[in-house]
Swiss-Prot record:
InterPro entries, A to Z: RNase_HII, RNase_HII/HIII, RNase_HII/HIII_dom, RNaseH-like_sf, RNaseH_sf
Required cofactor names: Mn(2+); Mg(2+)
GO MF annotation: an example: RNA binding
Gene: rnhB
Free-text comment on the cofactor: Manganese or magnesium. Binds 1 divalent metal ion per monomer in the absence of substrate. May bind a second metal ion after substrate binding.
Similarity field: Belongs to the RNase HII family.
Keyword terms, alphabetized: Cytoplasm, Endonuclease, Hydrolase, Manganese, Metal-binding, Nuclease
Name of this chain's protein: Ribonuclease HII
Stretches assigned to the RNase H type-2 domain: 9-198
EC numbers for this chain: 3.1.26.4
GO cellular component: cytoplasm; ribonuclease H2 complex
Keyword Phosphoprotein recorded: no
PANTHER family associated with the record: RIBONUCLEASE H2 SUBUNIT A, RIBONUCLEASE HII
Amino acid sequence: MLNFYNTKITVAGADEAGRGCLAGPVTAAAVILPIEFKNAVLNDSKTLNLKNRNFLKSLIEDEAITYGVAHVFMKEIDEINILNASILAMHRALQVLKFDPDHIIVDGNRFKPYQKIPHECIIKGDGKYMSIAAASILAKTYRDEFMEKIHEEFPDYNWKKNKGYPTKEHRAAIKKYGVTKYHRKSFKLLPDQLKIDF
């Protein structure tokens, strides 16, 4: 079972999903869990199957003291770059919380200060602390739902399966059908970028 970072202060865990995708938003979540929260299944969202992720999504939504989820969409990603967009998404998720935490813990190694609240970046934090793991699950499940929704609009890219990640199938579809409004124009969508007509 994962640990709490500090039970004496209010800590929000933050994480993002979709940073490496060619299409769709980068999505972040921030979660404050009650100190009595326990769940043996809770872990980094990447290690969980769909059934467990969906179960935990509902559990976190029901039992979190407060949580926030935010998307940063393609235009902003292209304008400010994916790292800044990922941090912006986490800031926006924190803004949605019902109150500010005393401390923020973030998965990974890059973050920018949010409202002068102390923070710590923790590499592989989603496999160490419950609030970051909870944030990773909300970020992934909310983003996956969005990608499944836009799949209906552009089924040729099979986003319901690849979720916008750079799979062979996704790149083949880009080569065949071109780019959509959901693609990140600043990303290298194909090995030979010159062949894409924006």
